[in-house]
Amino acid sequence: MPDDGLLTTRTQKPAPTAAVQAAVSQQPYLEFRNLTKVYATADGPVRALDQVSLAQRQGEFLSILGPSGCGKSTLLMLAAGLLPASNGVVTVRGKRVDAPRTDIGIVFQSPVLLEWRTALGNILLQAEARHLERKSAERRARELLAAVGLTGFEAKYPDELSGGMRQRVSICRALIHHPPQLLMDEPFGALDALTRDQLVLDLQRLWNDARMTVLFITHSVAEAVFLSDRVIVMTPRPGRIDRVIDIDLPRPRTLAMRETPEFNGYNRQILDLLLARGVLREC
């Protein structure tokens, strides 16, 4: 008869090795594998994305940059589970995304606030939809408003707020439930330059405090360089990944850094690429 101790030894699972643990920790947070998206239109099929493969690390600030129509927003909607892929797979922590995700915050170019609710009330709308405890949610909302410089504006309605203030409220609403990932689709595109600068600084501070994983869609080269760990440059439609650029600049970043040779070097690298691809044209 086999020895009981031997049987026990055979059925025990070995502890994970350091290599296995390292592999798990290095697993991408968000991954696109051979992703293609084709839209049906009256004029025939339109291929918005073509064979896009990309892995985002947990806690990474990743910007997607490219010309209009290259599929940037489509990529974000696929990441959110709000669109099905025509081909390919989207995964989060190794699990396939095949339905709208509930573990994210989303910020669009338009704040989309309810006019009959105050700034605080608009933020708490997200908490109510998720059935979060009221007292702790309100405390969190006030902390977020303070973090973006809106203390004292809690009871203001959207028509009493500037465009930049409304977008700050939208960002707070997206963060009320402590999402591990924030998806942002050109959130500062409709704002004036000074307001954009302030919101970029606010976003950097929020990201630095929480280190959530951010997927950021933008047309602004300087904005992408300032905020990102990596910048993904897309080709014109059908959108493919043209270049992946690591941004090796110290954090936290300051507005004065935009005048440094290092910052301008990244700017120039991306602009030269866009010129070479015909996205930009000089006289």
Task: Give the ranges of each region predicted by the language model.
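Conserved ABC transporter NBD signature motif
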Residues: 88-100
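Conserved ABC ATPase "signature" region
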Residues: 128, 135-153, 205
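Hydrophobic anchor residue at the start of the ABC signature
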Residues: 171
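Conserved signature/switch motifs of ABC ATPase nucleotide-binding domains
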Residues: 156-159, 177
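Short coil-to-helix segment of the ABC ATPase nucleotide-binding domain corresponding to the Q-loop/switch region
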Residues: 117-125
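Helix-to-loop junction immediately C-terminal to a conserved catalytic motif
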Residues: 80
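Catalytic Walker B motif of ABC-type/P-loop ATPase nucleotide-binding domains
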Residues: 182-185
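The feature captures the beta-strand-to-loop junction immediately N-terminal to the Walker
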Residues: 65-67
